[in-house]
């Protein structure tokens, strides 16, 4: 099962987080601090979207750099690093797709978070991989995202 997806800037500040397991805010914060401490020295080696792996607290975490952002995908023991890397590919492609006009920067990503969430919800459902084809993800997401909101008399 996929436990979480975290996206940080290059300073380690959380820009986006999505947890698929039920842990409280205190444990989330503790996990995020530990993750930063365990991986910060390796960030320089993750350039060009090279996937790196770390394991602590019984979780396997695959992380990589995309543009100005660091992405961390954490899974339980039943998922190995290869399975997590496979889940990473549609996430990275989706991130690049929504940021293609201005590039993958922190500011551009923040502006595009609503669309990214739609993409992510198509890729991962309740902690399990659902869609991997970018075309399918775009099609499902565009159906949800591009429909205008109509104001009717209530």
UniProtKB/Swiss-Prot annotation:
The keyword Transcription regulation does not apply. InterPro entries: AP_mu_sigma_su (IPR022775), Coatomer_zeta (IPR039652), Longin-like_dom_sf (IPR011012). Disruption phenotype: Knockout cells grow at least as fast as a control axenic strain and differentiation also appears normal with fruiting bodies forming under appropriate stimuli. Uptake of FITC-dextran, an assay for fluid phase endocytosis, is unimpaired while uptake of FM1-43, a membrane marker, is slower than in the control. SUPFAM superfamilies: SNARE-like (SSF64356). Keywords: Cell membrane, Cytoplasm, Membrane. GO terms for biological process: intra-Golgi vesicle-mediated transport; intracellular protein transport; membrane reorganization involved in phagocytosis, engulfment; retrograde vesicle-mediated transport, Golgi to endoplasmic reticulum. It comes from the Eukaryota. GO terms for cellular component: COPI vesicle coat; plasma membrane. Gene3D superfamilies: 3.30.450.60. Its main location: membrane. It is a peripheral membrane protein. It is found in: Cell membrane; Cytoplasm. Belongs to the adaptor complexes small subunit family. This is TSET complex member tstD. It comes from Dictyostelium discoideum. The lineage of its organism: Eukaryota, Amoebozoa, Evosea, Eumycetozoa, Dictyostelia. The gene is tstD.
